[in-house]
Amino acid sequence: MKKLTRPLLFLLACLVWACSSTKSLKPGQILYTGAEVKINPDSSGKIDNEKQIKNDLEAKTRPRPNSSILGIKFKLGLYNLAGEPKKPKGFRNWLRKKGEAPVLLNDVKLKYNNDVLTSYLISEGYLQANVTGDTIVKEKKGKAIYTAVTGQRYKINKVTFPPDTGILTKNINVNKDKTLLKVGDFYDIDTYKNERIRIDNDLKEIGYFYFSPDYLIIQVDSTIGKNLVNIKVKVKDIAPDAAIKPYTVKNINIYPNYSLRRDSALRKLNPLVYNDFNIYDNRNTFKPKLFDRLVFFQKGEAYNRKDHNQSLNRMVNVGAFQDVRVEFLPVDSFRNNQLDLNIYLTPLKKNSLTFSVTGTSKSNNFVGSEVKVTQTTRNLFRNAEQLDLSVSGGFETQTKGTSLGKNSLSFTAEGKLTFPRLIVPFYKPNSTNAFIPKTITSLSYQMLNRGSEYTLHAIKGEYGYNFKENQYKEHNFNPISISYVATSFPDTNTRDSLFKNNPLLRSTLENQFIVGSNYNFTYTNQMEDSRRNNVYFYGALETGGNVWGLFTSKNNEGKRTIFNVPLTQFIRVEADLRDYYKITKNLIWANRLNLGYGYAYGNSSSLPFVKQFFAGGSNDVRAFPARTLGPGTYKVRDDAIFADQGGDIKLMLNSELRFKIVSIFYGALFVDAGNIWLRKEDLGEPGKPETARLGSGFRLKNTFNELAVGTGAGLRVDVSIFVVRLDVAFPVRKPYLPEGQRWVFNDINFGSKDWRRQNLIFNIGIGYPF
């Protein structure tokens, strides 16, 4: 570490000099450093949520000061470092554009901010609030100080709704007990806006298609004294006749093969009348019964927003249309209370072909590429089905380490057929959810050739269902999941050598039938960008051999088999919880907890290789090569023929601080911790202690003492449609070392070539690690 002290100090000095915030200021210019709000400074009275109100007020001031990361104004530093470019192009000009010009105190408009902050306080119920502003200058830096005198916060004394003088006001009063305006609550303008929206939503459900929240007024009387207000809800006199009467649906016209070019021709067609639908399509693109599942409206019923939104969502999510447009038109120019519903659907192309090439560089020193071709056929049986046929092949070679020059080949072929409905034997479900449920069948073959070690063949077939409960929750259930896994070896000597050094591999890599079911659940609110805290959760349960084990007999060895292949029996559960906390717009603290547990029983002594848990790698504990960490305190030998180490139990924790550097470049600082374990210690074969994996068994009291810990930094290029990342990590805790020696901070030596070769792990990946 001492060898790096001088270079680091020099680099730090250059950084401080470049980031000097006042370096480029001209004489008389003052750098604006931000705003501070003081609430009732001359009074001992405290207001509710003072800290939150203070933060909200400071956030509303303009302009914003120059951005900073951990207190350092990097963008201003880039601007200062660039200076005045002498050429219209070039590096200095580019650097200046990526930076930020200094925000000056002269840019602050005190009166404007006074008015904005006062208005905000009034909207929060401080009807007598007043804000005044001033500036403070120290050397070349200045800030704005705003003093807010709030007065008392007003409460609601009484709420009055319009009298029942007509159908509209009667319908408003029907749900007045659901009002958001509660006697005793504080005055809050956002609540009043939401109350208007609530009334509008209620009316939209009973036919008031043309009504709008703008036709409601909420009058506030603050003259009654004692810091109280009376609230009166009224319908504006200017509300048009169309807005104050309910409408029913007369005709439902569907154009399933619509285009602007064919618009006039389609309207001249004689429609196919099916149930309540008039279908205009002389090409019979879709079967009419498809629209029973997509369109929730019926002739003669009152318009309601729920059916409107559910119909729209289903048509968008069915995966058959590139454009969906829904139009409600008044019949006979508003002379009656009826609407015609016109649905214009533009189908996606029947067939499409996608081709992709990806490069890989893994933390176990394998580099290579993969080619994938996917053929998609839509609307296969004219019911919006989708058939996906894909073929992919990949090649990897190890560039360094004890397995230098080892190659890995992979080939995958998969067919997947998706039906936009639930297909359940002996039952016809009727789903009214906005998100259309799907039945998915798939069949795949995968071959993985690990050079001179082994070749893994896997055939898998599944039948199951996918359905979204709402925009946050998604379920996948495969009641039938059948896999056949077979392993071949170059010769018997290779096989015997593998099993001799690791007897547990015999049960792991033997030919197996996996017949079972699986279910997984996903919850996420990541689509809500306005949230400060976003959460993602994934939970999975998988079983194998449970039911089939009851119907298969045992062979001479006491094994239950299907076609003379052992039936695998196990239970496997996994949970993945992630939290993303936005400290600022460009600074996010991401955390993950990953847990896994597998239990083999009955016919099986260990989990199948494809169902085991692994640790290490670019999306795991990044300071350790992929699949080489654990189990427990065991360390695989450097000369091991088979380095992959699987386990029955997994615990992993990741914490990552993500920040924007400039433009599309983002940085990250991270810490990873985790390990895998076997449920029981692997003692090897009797009389062969060299085959044992000592320390591999799970003991609850030793869990945290046996965690591996790594840390590092990353650079990410985020261009919206994909993210390319480079992470470099190194271990700070090695669980396979003797107790008391596992923390290795004192061994860190970036100046040592040997230390870097043995400890630095580079990970290149597509997308974020979690």
State the predicted function of each range:
Residues 3-10:
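Sec-dependent signal peptide recognition
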Residues 284-285, 304-538, 622-623, 629, ...:
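Gram-negative/organellar outer-membrane beta-barrel architecture
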Residues 39-41, 148-152, 163, 233-237, ...:
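Flexible glycine-/small-residue-rich
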Residues 370-376, 412-416, 442, 516-522, ...:
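One-face residue pattern on beta-strands with alternating periodicity enriched for small/polar residues
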Residues 2-3, 20-317:
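Interaction-mediating elements
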Residues 126, 208, 350, 382-384, ...:
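Strand-connecting loop/turn motifs
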Residues 276-280, 360-364, 476-659, 669-701:
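C-terminal outer-membrane beta-barrel translocator/porin domains of Gram-negative envelope proteins
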Residues 15-18:
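C-terminal motif of bacterial Sec signal peptides marking the signal peptidase cleavage site
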